[in-house]
Amino acid sequence: MALKFAANLNFLFTERATSIAERIRLAHQNGFRAVEIPYPEGETSDVVSAVKETGVVVSLVNLAFDKSDDQLRFGSTSVPGSEKLFRSQLDATIDFARQVNCGKIHLTAGLFKGGQESDYTKTYTANLKIAADSLRASKMIGVIEPINKYAVPGYYMNSYSKAAGILADVAADNIQLLADLYHLQHLHGNVSKTLEEYKALIGHFQIAQVPHRHEPDVSGELDYGFVFKALQEFGYDGWIGCEYKPKTTTVEGLGWVSKLGYTL
């Protein structure tokens, strides 16, 4: 089974373009057939035009977020008192995802800023159940991602066991786990064993080398030659998000694809 790679435009081509629309064009020009994007606040029409112009697949969209609030800039799904905001952000993101034919939304959790963790868990679970119903009506999937404390200190969703417990409580087949191997290695190590343990829950993958989050072929803790073969054996046939920080420039770093025996 051939692996398929999508350019994460929060990380790639940022040195050449500030707008998401222009990054989409650059990704297409450099061989990517799919992209992952944040909710494009203020440029939705331009992004829709760029997607139609290039024909790229939008494989993942991040939930809209509030840039003006330190706690909510990483999402609102788990944050008590933000339920109304979450629903409006969810509706806006689903509407945008429809326009670009994207079937998958990353339901970002937000930051834990004190109080009772049980309140965050209750809010998160309730909001994910709401999301499951809304996404199902649009034939979409929602994913949740455990993120390590070095990348985003205080992020609520910070372990695979916590994610598994939440998903069990939500009990919706269209709310799944996003396995970012960069975060997974930081959080738990033993990537292949952890993936096998949570295999049934995973609906999306992202990649980057550890510890510096560069390209997969850069020297680091993970052997991506082995990892990619494991993903093929895993049977995953969706897009794999390239959510890494280019060591030099995006284009100069794309040699990893052919070096590891793949194509875009």
Curated annotation (Swiss-Prot):
It catalyses: 3-hydroxypyruvate = 2-hydroxy-3-oxopropanoate. GO terms for cellular component: extracellular region. One of its GO terms (molecular function) is hydroxypyruvate isomerase activity. InterPro entries: HyI-like, Sugar_Epim/Isomerase, Xyl_isomerase-like_sf, Xyl_isomerase-like_TIM-brl. One of its GO terms (biological process) is glyoxylate metabolic process. Its EC number is 5.3.1.22. The active site is at 145 (proton donor/acceptor), 243 (proton donor/acceptor). Keywords: Isomerase. Belongs to the hyi family. PANTHER family: HYDROXYPYRUVATE ISOMERASE-RELATED, ISOMERASE. Catalyzes the reversible isomerization between hydroxypyruvate and 2-hydroxy-3-oxopropanoate (also termed tartronate semialdehyde). This is Putative hydroxypyruvate isomerase. It comes from Drosophila melanogaster.
